[in-house]
Design a protein with these regions (language model features):
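PEST-like low-complexity, intrinsically disordered acidic/proline/serine-rich tracts
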Residues: 1-26
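Acidic, serine/threonine-rich low-complexity disordered tracts
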Residues: 33-150
Length: 150
């Protein structure tokens, strides 16, 4: 799920730090996204999110076969309202939102890589300074399939 948050740098929170569960789970179980780690990860890109305006969860949706390999199917989403985007000094943000939906197929054999990932992210905001209005609305959708080498 690196496409959701970003590529990991030394010392940064990993996707497992943000989306995984510390407990064993069964199909149908849901758990919250690690809000603290997610918000810190966005902060690296100068996106400021208040904890009370961020929510997200991940679900173990099932066990599926992908290319004959048994995988856990994880799905999830997160949402941030009224965040502070990186806008020029003096601009006042009137409205902002960030939503993401994601899914992935993770082999039960942890030596194998994630085989499928789907990510759909939308970020928008509107800000102004005197007569100048700044609007941003971007949607990124990715479908990634991995074929392990023998």
């Amino acid at each position: 799920l690196q496409q959701v948050i970003g590529l990991d740098n030394e010392g940064d929170a990993t996707d497992d730090d943000i989306f995984s569960s510390k407990e064993k789970r069964k199909v149908g179980d849901k758990w919250p996204v690690n809000k603290k780690n997610a918000i810190e990860d966005f902060r690296k890109d100068d996106i400021r999110i208040d904890a009370d305006r961020f929510k997200g969860e991940t679900e173990l949706a099932g066990v599926v076969k992908v290319k004959g390999i048994e995988c856990y199917r994880l799905t999830g989403s997160f949402d941030a309202k009224q965040f502070q985007p990186p806008v020029p000094r003096g601009f006042r943000v009137q409205e902002s939102g960030l939503t993401a939906k994601y899914a992935g197929s993770f082999p039960i054999d942890t030596n194998l890589p994630e085989l499928e990932t789907t990510v759909d992210i939308r970020m928008y905001f509107r800000a102004s300074l005197r007569n100048v209005e700044l609007e941003f609305d971007r949607r990124l959708k990715k479908d990634i399939t991995v074929t392990p080498l023998n």
